[in-house]
Amino acid sequence: MISAGMIARNFGKRFFSTKPSVLINKHTKVICQGFTGNQGTFHSKQAIEYGTNMVGGVSPGKGGQKHLDLPVFNTVKEAKEATGANATVIYVPPPHAAAAIKEAIDAEMELVVCITEGIPQQDMVKVKYLLNKQNKTRLIGPNCPGIIKPGECKIGIMPGHIHKPGKIGIVSRSGTLTYEAVAQTTAVGLGQSTCIGIGGDPFNGTNFIDCLKMFTQDPQTEGIILIGEIGGEAEEEAAQWLIDNPTDKPVVSFIAGLSAPPGRRMGHAGAIISGGKGDANSKIEALKAAGVTVTFSPAKLGETILQKMNEKKNK
């Protein structure tokens, strides 16, 4: 049986990274699929106000119209050809979200960010198959808050005002815990280089290892926060990658679900301990063995990464 981890690893090997060093910057041209819907409208407006270079949107049957003073197109291909967009964000209901991702892959959009929660896993298995056959498109999500480079580009539903341009790369399976880490790193004066919410579903497009590779190679990123949760083996695989690819950048982690009972889904579709695997303790031990500093309280992420950054500076 093919596991989510195996599919994710294969995708990571097939994708060839391009500039910018961590996926987005102020030059990224973004379109929105589901542009004229309630969610697409609300979050596109927020992105524009933040300064994101939104260049248009897609709503089938509404091509030729204007929305938020931007052009509306019937297809992703048309939008890409007309605007030069290289990223798309998807606010499409679960029954149609996989088709929206496939359309973006077919159009060879470089970055696809799918916010939608509740996409059937069978649909996502088919999407993963398409992703694994190509090297033009990277998917972030689904069921994620998105990605942000503070002060430059916001693609997703995260609150922009808590972010501050800085030096900490944050990758997380949890949206709200991402915001907690952001608020704390802003409060202690470190700020963030890039924040990536990889999503809480079993079949996602970008995993911890993909993000660790980018953060360790990114000159702006001087420290890393990794937020995991119960379910799957993504954290253990990330720990093994760090053992095989040591970095001098401090890595701090928090794993949610320490007291979660086996066999019960805890929020996200992927947050379930099954078959004796995926519990918080095994993830924590694996990360510690890789030299990661694990905090047992999300309230201490900011002070812990600051401490580790200062320790490195004073060596």
UniProtKB/Swiss-Prot annotation:
Binding site for CoA: T36, G37, N38, Q39, K62, I115, T116, E117
Source organism (scientific name): Dictyostelium discoideum
Protein name per UniProt: Succinate--CoA ligase [ADP/GDP-forming] subunit alpha, mitochondrial
EC number: 6.2.1.4, 6.2.1.5
Catalytic activity, reaction form: GTP + succinate + CoA = succinyl-CoA + GDP + phosphate; succinate + ATP + CoA = succinyl-CoA + ADP + phosphate
Assembly description: Heterodimer of an alpha and a beta subunit. Different beta subunits determine nucleotide specificity. Together with an ATP-specific beta subunit, forms an ADP-forming succinyl-CoA synthetase (A-SCS). Together with a GTP-specific beta subunit forms a GDP-forming succinyl-CoA synthetase (G-SCS).
Primary subcellular site in the record, as a coarse category: mitochondrion
Function field: Succinyl-CoA synthetase functions in the citric acid cycle (TCA), coupling the hydrolysis of succinyl-CoA to the synthesis of either ATP or GTP and thus represents the only step of substrate-level phosphorylation in the TCA. The alpha subunit of the enzyme binds the substrates coenzyme A and phosphate, while succinate binding and specificity for either ATP or GTP is provided by different beta subunits.
Active site per the UniProt annotation: H268 (tele-phosphohistidine intermediate)
Record-stated family: Belongs to the succinate/malate CoA ligase alpha subunit family.
